[in-house]
């Protein structure tokens, strides 16, 4: 198997449809002021459809998180060099793969529970692209600190949506996955400190990459 797998070669069946993140950002429907409102509020007429779309986004995001964590286990030789990953980091990422695989299964079943199906909404691949930076430290800040941190807000939103609509299944599952995301963020922060303790320039570059991913994922980078 080759290392540093390109995003174009991700394995997907015919149900999946891919879209570039810039296409989503500049979609006229998303630029409409009404699209900036809380589309999951109980009094919002399309809240159920919006929730299904968000759930599908969580599902494909968890697939990419699994793929990205797995690539970090495989892409780098074990070691302490800049182009290597310590064995302990690879082990932590292997553990995270188990979490992400569980999240994929849960999210897929939640999609069914909410009346959605795989491929009903398009997939964009920002998460996997951030997860496959050539520097393992930038992977940590781009995914574990930035995207996993933002995922905490997403899971909270879906948990609260489930509570407001009296759906204990959705609320419980989102709260369960939320607990894992907190540990992923902490793991990324811990390894960032360890790997850049004697390299402030590398730490600066990693934090700048985190900010860039934050802006991009929050639709503020274009």
What does each model-identified segment do?
Residues 1-222:
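Non-heme di-metal
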């Amino acid at each position: 198997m080759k290392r540093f797998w390109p995003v174009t070669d991700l394995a997907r069946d015919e149900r999946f449809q891919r879209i570039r993140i810039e296409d989503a950002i500049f979609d006229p429907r998303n630029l409409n002021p009404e699209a900036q409102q809380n589309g999951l509020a109980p009094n919002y007429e399309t809240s159920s459809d919006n929730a299904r779309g968000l759930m599908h986004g969580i599902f494909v995001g968890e697939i990419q998180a699994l793929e990205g964590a797995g690539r970090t286990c495989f892409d780098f030789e074990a070691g302490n060099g800049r182009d290597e990953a310590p064995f302990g980091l690879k082990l932590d990422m292997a553990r995270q793969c188990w979490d992400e695989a569980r999240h994929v299964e849960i999210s897929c079943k939640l999609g069914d529970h909410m009346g959605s199906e795989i491929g009903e909404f398009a997939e964009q691949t920002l998460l996997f692209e951030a997860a496959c930076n050539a520097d393992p430290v930038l992977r940590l800040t781009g995914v574990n600190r930035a995207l996993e941190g933002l995922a905490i807000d997403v899971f909270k939103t879906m948990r609260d949506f489930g509570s407001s609509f009296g759906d204990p299944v959705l609320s419980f599952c989102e709260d369960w996955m939320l607990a894992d995301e907190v540990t992923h963020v902490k793991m990324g922060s811990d390894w960032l400190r360890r790997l850049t303790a004697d390299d402030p320039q590398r730490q600066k570059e990693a934090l700048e990459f985190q900010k860039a991913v934050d802006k991009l994922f929050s639709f503020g980078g274009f």
